[in-house]
From Swiss-Prot:
It comes from the Eukaryota. GO terms for biological process: carnitine transmembrane transport; carnitine transport; cholesterol transport; in utero embryonic development; intracellular transport; positive regulation of cation transmembrane transport; positive regulation of protein localization to membrane; positive regulation of protein targeting to membrane. This is Na(+)/H(+) exchange regulatory cofactor NHE-RF3. It comes from Rattus norvegicus (Rat). The modification Phosphoserine is found at residues 108, 148, 192, 250, 334, 348, 492, 495, 512, 514-516, 518.
Amino acid sequence: MASTFNPRECKLSKKEGQNYGFFLRIEKDTDGHLVRVIEEGSPAEKAGLLDGDRVLRINGVFVDKEEHAQVVDLVRKSGNSVTLLVLDGDSYEKAVKHQVDLKELDQSPREPALNEKKPDLGMNGGVETCAQPRLCYLVKEGNSFGFSLKTIQGKKGVFLTDITPQGVAMKAGVLADDHLIEVNGENVENASHEEVVEKVTKSGSRIMFLLVDKETARCHSEQKTPFKRETASLKLLPHQPRVVVIKKGSNGYGFYLRAGPEQKGQIIKDIEPGSPAEAAGLKNNDLVVAVNGESVEALDHDGVVEMIRNGGDQTTLLVLDKEADRIYSLARFSPLLYCQSQELPNGSVKEAPAPISAPLEAPGSATTEDVGDHKPKLCRLIKEDDSYGFHLNAIRGQPGSFVKEVQQGGPADKAGLENEDIIIEVNGENVQDEPYDRVVERIKSSGEHVTLLVCGKVAYSYFQAKKIPILSSLADPLVAGPDAKGETEHDSAESTKDSSHPARDRTLSAASHSSSNSEDTVM
């Protein structure tokens, strides 16, 4: 029965600030997410969308049974291009009536017709260049990673399917029908479905996948070339190695190097305030992986010290914090591969931004010195006298909230919050597009302490202009204080949600309950 239904793949592209030119809606007594009111000459019309079409998949993710608000959100967050798999209205209603599994429609790649040419994408000297495999790091939320595993008759390997919209897998960069190459650094290309399921189950709450999308898998299959793990893209990993270039001062570099009793290798300790090490971005408990471009993982303490001394008045260190070390160890990848994939400017600290729900290229025009001058801030506030010591303000009818009237000496002031700081995250959840009341509710429900990711106006404008997502990984990590209740230096709230939103003009009005154009709450 399923073979009698023919969904259509419609690829829509629009310019910045333009609409796709159609309405996506639900209607009473009508199943599915409907396409309506297609504008003449719009991207929707050009892509072949028809009135009454039902949307089955968005960018490969099955959405027919999802909440309508989530489906709309997926389209909006796709940027300036989106791929929709749709079924015409009559066929959809027949499929529902006959209880056809809509997930199974158009699951296998369509073969080109005899008179149809394959697209010449990624061609280099007449040979198609296959895209990179990619590492995806998943941390379970609740009891689910947000995907299912499947095998396809006649195809070798195990594939990922049923990707939950805005779930763990999607946020980590997993795509529908991805071919699974490795689980936690172990190749599973020849493993059975049951063996892969067992490996995933035994992984616990954290797992690392090496994946290729279906087009990349097809490319390698046609060229009969194996996947090379050393070519994998690392940009989706939430914590990355850092390259730190330090120039020696009059009193040396300003840090101690120690062999870690609990952590392997040589660990950075006791960084002196105001020292060259602190200024260069070195952190306590960083693990040293390479010195001046050479791996030191196999050297003892004296050997690493000697290499640093041999650098003269300047040394370059490749370091990992504890979480980055944990991630790369799980993947069984050398951090040196990260260096090989980066173009590092001289005399800078390179910190890669964390991923969002889809791969993002770092803007080529932004130098690391620029980013270092425009950092968001992680602020952990401990309530005093039932107050956080600041007002929250917003422009009525517009998304986004910002800080006003920070009380001197209050919790907000102590945590580093400043007037007109823009709220990006509350306890790791991105709130840039949330209504004012919802942000207030999140902060109030936090109890005695709350962690905010905020950005000053100048830094916010910089990130928006450069199209750099504002993520907590760009901020300096929180340091555990006497009231931190056992949290470690690296226990900071991380968000994988897309926060690359267009800059919004704001009139930063004074906090007032009676203002006609703003909303304000004492926190």
